[in-house]
């Protein structure tokens, strides 16, 4: 996979990308990342990339020229292609696991990271997706883009040590992940559930599914609306929602 990132703060992106899973993917030659400082493409004599909005208003907007020219550079380095272009924007669709799975199918992704008050609307003619990390405000798009990149790259083939890790993660099944334990069996009186020590994998799977449903119902009931639930799952949920008499 090839990923391009357009940003005003390349160091915010370059350093984290060479750590952990994403860094291993780069080292293994399964991922190639280029980071472009679009300020370098400003034709303004002062190198400005922002200006006041027409009609008034607080803050400054990113001007189209530097980003358009930076995208031309990306095209020149990638056989005249920018791949699938993602604008990191608080007004976009909220990022989720399904979107990460969709991105992981692409050969080339380009992320545009904003700053200041927002973008000149004409910049959006360059993009395929406008994506937000959530309903909160951060200073720029770099941290959000890094999160999306990490969530996407870990889904690529042969990136994780255990191929089942990505499948078992929270949200991959539409539910939150079940509780997990490791050694020791008893830590300061806090014991591992006996079912996990039984060796009965059928019962363990049942316990994990029930715990996953229980956690999702308590913390993210909205996920149950789109999760693929079996008749057994629905019965478990009915029992969980029935108060003890």
Swiss-Prot record:
One of its GO terms (cellular component) is cytosol. It is found in: Cytoplasm. InterPro entries: Alpha/beta_knot_MTases, tRNA_m1G_MeTrfase_C_sf, tRNA_m1G_MeTrfase_TrmD, tRNA_m1G_MTases_N, tRNA_MeTrfase_TRMD/TRM10. Keywords: Cytoplasm, Methyltransferase, S-adenosyl-L-methionine, Transferase, tRNA processing. Specifically methylates guanosine-37 in various tRNAs. Belongs to the RNA methyltransferase TrmD family. This is tRNA (guanine-N(1)-)-methyltransferase. It comes from Pediococcus pentosaceus (strain ATCC 25745 / CCUG 21536 / LMG 10740 / 183-1w).
């Amino acid at each position: 996979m090839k990923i391009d990132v357009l940003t005003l703060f390349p160091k915010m992106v370059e350093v984290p990308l060479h750590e952990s899973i994403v860094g291993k993917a780069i080292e293994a030659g399964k991922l190639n990342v280029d980071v472009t400082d679009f300020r370098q493409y400003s034709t303004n004599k002062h190198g400005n990339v922002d200006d006041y909005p027409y009609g008034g208003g607080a803050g400054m907007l990113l001007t189209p020229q530097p980003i358009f020219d930076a995208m031309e550079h990306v095209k020149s380095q990638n056989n005249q292609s920018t791949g699938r272009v993602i604008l990191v924007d608080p007004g976009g669709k909220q990022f989720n696991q399904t979107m990460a799975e969709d991105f992981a199918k692409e050969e080339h992704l380009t992320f545009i990271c904003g700053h200041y008050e927002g973008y000149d609307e004409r910049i959006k003619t360059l993009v395929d997706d406008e994506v937000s990390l959530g309903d909160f405000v951060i200073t720029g798009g770099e941290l959000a883009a890094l999160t999306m990149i990490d969530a996407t790259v870990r889904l690529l083939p042969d990136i994780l040590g255990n191929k089942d890790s990505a499948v078992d993660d929270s949200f991959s099944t539409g539910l939150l992940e079940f509780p997990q334990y490791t050694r020791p069996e008893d830590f300061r009186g806090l014991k591992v559930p006996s079912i996990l020590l039984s060796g009965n994998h059928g019962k363990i799977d049942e316990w994990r599914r029930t715990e996953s449903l229980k956690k999702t119902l308590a913390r993210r009931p909205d996920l149950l609306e789109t999760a693929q639930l079996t008749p057994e799952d629905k019965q478990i949920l009915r029992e969980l929602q029935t108060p003890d008499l």
